[in-house]
Amino acid sequence: MSVFEIVFSPTGGTQKVSGLVAGALDKNTVTVDLTDSGLDFSAVSMTEDDVAVISVPAYAGRIPAVVADRLGMVHGNGARAVLVCVYGNRAFEDTLVELEDVAKHAGFRVIAAVAAIAEHSIARQFAAGRPDAQDAAQLAEFAQQIQQKLLAEDASEPSIPGNRPYKQAGGHRMAPEATEDCVSCGACAAACPVCAIDKGDPKRAAGEACISCMRCIAVCPRGARKLDPNKLSAVSQMLSKVCVVRKECELFI
């Protein structure tokens, strides 16, 4: 049995949660990076003896469309899947059920699902520092329960909350822009999951292709990519009404 960690984590929060879950199942995991636009995902194949921890962020209550496309190319071949949805302390809404459907279509058998919290990728003051020690303890406990289910060869499907049809994909696209501090090093263009930034001139970006994942901001060594401050302020004000009360991690098994 091999444990695969299939993860989409543009700013690192989802990776932290995913690592806590997958690492508790097996210290030696095989990583499939869904942010890597150059990877041939159709070449990724598992067996029914394998386990895949599939971890994605919630974007306005849905999985990123690029995740559905890339995960859909993977050959699950009956491997057991643990779904992990990470959100910024607002709500995960239909993310897990959509991920469940995509995973099943790719040939996985879903045996468990986790909803966890990490620092909000846009308004970083919300859920700052998460996953924290309390989250890590909860996720370790979840992983133990999942491990017991695997050892018992229990293939029953969990009851996962969410709606079908899913909520309409929405949210206003917020594309970061280069500031005068940009030196065109190209780090952002190389890291963009959807190739929305011109590699020849990183100050140019295709706003319509941007998925607002904030990876370009996260990887810029000079802090030279920013969101429009007025738009960021408006989003922060909206989120302040729904992100104040601490949400806890949840296990569906």
PLM feature segments, named:
Residues 2-36, 42-173, 230-236, 240-253:
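FMN-binding flavodoxin-like domain, especially the glycine-rich phosphate-binding loop
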Residues 178, 183-211, 215-232:
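Iron-sulfur cluster-binding cysteine motifs and their immediate structural context
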